[in-house]
Amino acid sequence: MKQLIFCLLLFSATAASAELPSATTSMVKQTLASGKPTVIDLGARTCIPCKKMAPILEGLTREYQGRANVLFIDVREDSAAGDRFKVRMIPTQIFFNAQGKEVNRHIGFMDKTGLIKELKAAGVK
C-alpha cells in the first residue's frame, strides 16, 4: 500500500511539472511581436478551473505549434501581470491577433472548442 501511495505521489508531482511555465514579461512581449495569434491564460496553479484548463492549454500548444502561441501566467506568482492585463477574475483568457492587438477576452473556464473558436477568430489558420 505504501508503494502505491508513493507511486501516486510521484505521478502527481510529475504531472504537475508538465504544466506550461508561467510566462515572464519579456516572453509575453516577444510572443506578441512574433506575428502569430496568441492566447494568454491568466490564472493560478491553485485555482480549480485553471487546473482543469492546464492540459487543454498544453495540448493546444502542441497542436498549434508554429501557427499560434499559447501562454500561461500565474498571477499569484506575478501579480503585476494581473494589473497590467486588468484581470478581475481568474482564469481570464486574452486573445491577440497576429499584430499583437487584443481582440477578445473571456473570464472563467474555457473548453478546447471555445479556445479553438477564439483562436480562429484571432486569425489562426
Annotate each language-model stretch with its function.
Residues 35-38, 42-46, 89:
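Short pre-active-site segment immediately N-terminal to redox-active cysteine/selenocysteine motifs
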Residues 98-125:
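Non-catalytic, surface beta->alpha helical segment in thiol-disulfide oxidoreductase systems
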Residues 86-94:
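Structural micro-motif
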Residues 4-12:
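Sec-dependent N-terminal signal peptides
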Residues 61, 66-79:
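Thiol-based oxidoreductase modules, predominantly thioredoxin-like and allied folds used
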Residues 20-37:
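A short beta-strand-turn-helix
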Residues 51-63:
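Typically the conserved alpha-helix immediately C-terminal to a functionally engaged Cys/Sec
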